[in-house]
């Protein structure tokens, strides 16, 4: 993994108190061989996204014949990151967001998820607590389904039992045939893990459950397995591949201060799910990665990161999987102005790859669901699904 550029409060305070002295040392002793202070100052401003202030420090290391090789490599990487940021700012991509009428109301709607055939749109709606749902500081959250009617989607209705029965439910994924649904359920429990600082503290324990549609009804929610859902980890935001064999999700191993990473698990021959596997580099970093969305092409992964170079906060990225070795290529920032200085996440793409959907408050104080035409370079591969049943004619 790469070195972390986030600035913990203690480090910021320590650097702030020494900043003027370090700068003075560099001014007085420009040939001082130990470039520790120069690198620290560059990283300090880099972490604050003050790239114009950080750039001269990295350039100084690059130009110094006596600088250590590891410092030169690090400075060179930082300068490349700065150039990437400048390119993002100056080169905008096509983006005309349109509020999705029907599902969008005066309440908050977010975490959209399309069924792979685009017939249904699932999302979370936050409403006053006199409505059914999981209580949340005077509001409740409903898991809602909207049906496509011609070129529009309906306003949506709450999903029936076993959904919306009191727990927080959201962050779903659904199979190609619309008959297997994965959902995140959050329960507040005391922490009993190895992190002594958090032992006994209450935390939001997120787990992934599934339900199958049989005879027109959804079955009772079941855990995907105790090897994935544990009482000491946060496992959420599932995304199932088109063949139902790989499940991607977000995991926090240490709920108190741990990083978010994207994991996957593989379906076993007996139908169970294998142990979680961290996707590793180049997807995961020392920062946070979350909200994975594996498109139905099974090769294009969209996700959010606050560490890969971006516009600020959480940015949307996409990465293509190599079909031969099943490894992901380096992720690409989806671009400005889709990404902003705020947080972007909960991003999904239609089956044909032409439209993207996300939750945003850009139209006013309420979160609503928006869609836009996704530009060509960021689209997944074109795919075709055939609906129907195989019958033996003999």
Residue ranges and their predicted role:
Residues 30-36, 47, 51-53, 63-389, ...:
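Short, conserved micro-motifs composed of acidic
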